[in-house]
Curated annotation (Swiss-Prot):
Gene designation: Ten1
Entry superkingdom: Eukaryota
Broad class of the protein's primary localization: nucleus
Cited InterPro entries: NA-bd_OB-fold, Ten1_animal_plant
Family: Belongs to the TEN1 family.
Role according to the record: Component of the CST complex proposed to act as a specialized replication factor promoting DNA replication under conditions of replication stress or natural replication barriers such as the telomere duplex. The CST complex binds single-stranded DNA with high affinity in a sequence-independent manner, while isolated subunits bind DNA with low affinity by themselves. Initially the CST complex has been proposed to protect telomeres from DNA degradation. However, the CST complex has been shown to be involved in several aspects of telomere replication.
Protein's UniProt keywords contain Nucleus: yes
The name this protein goes by in its record: CST complex subunit TEN1
Taxonomic lineage: Eukaryota, Metazoa, Chordata, Craniata, Vertebrata
Self-association and partners: Component of the CST complex, composed of TEN1, CTC1 and STN1; in the complex interacts directly with STN1.
GO annotations of cellular component type: chromosome, telomeric region; CST complex; nucleus
One Pfam family cited in the UniProt record for this chain: Ten1_2
Length: 161
């Protein structure tokens, strides 16, 4: 059986305890600290690194080349460690340095809105936005697979000798 695909969560949602234990999640953060001996890395939220940090267990994805202050995306399961702290057990760890974080955040919010709309009852249309109009159809006589210059001489490209 395949593992669950993972729901996107912002790093501060995970560190604030808004994600239930055992959930499969996707999140991101800047590599703040990597302890190779314990197979643990600390990811910090890019906007507030001193306030929001996540522990990530890396024993399933090692060896990997760790770059401090680079942006990483992680797919894994949220577990509780001895002592009560939460850790994300990484199944997939990807360096995504250079990714547009504001665009990623917008995409996550848009995906959440879409999923919420899909979960609403069909009769409850009061909270749904009006759908966009369908695109205009193109007349079938304007569609042609033939080249426009049929029967005309096409000059060959010039070559330099």
């Amino acid at each position: 059986m395949l593992p669950k695909p993972g729901v996107y969560y912002f790093p501060w949602e995970v560190s604030d305890g808004h994600v239930p234990e055992g959930s499969t999640l996707r999140t991101f953060g800047r590599l703040y600290l990597y302890d190779m001996a314990r197979s643990l890395m600390t990811l910090a939220a890019p906007q507030k690194p001193d306030q929001c940090q996540l522990l990530v267990c890396t024993n399933l994805v090692e060896p990997f080349e760790a770059h401090v202050n680079f942006l990483y995306m992680v797919l894994g399961d949220l577990e509780r460690m001895e002592g009560g702290a939460f850790v994300v057990r990484a199944r997939l760890l990807t360096c995504v340095e250079g990714m547009d974080l504001s665009l990623l955040e917008k995409a996550i919010l848009e995906q959440r809105r879409h999923l919420q709309k899909r979960q609403q009852p069909i009769g409850d249309a009061s909270t749904l936005q009006t759908p966009t109009p369908a695109p205009q159809s193109i007349p079938s006589d304007s569609l042609s697979l033939e080249p426009e210059n049929r029967g005309q001489q096409v000059p060959l490209p010039q070559t330099l000798d």
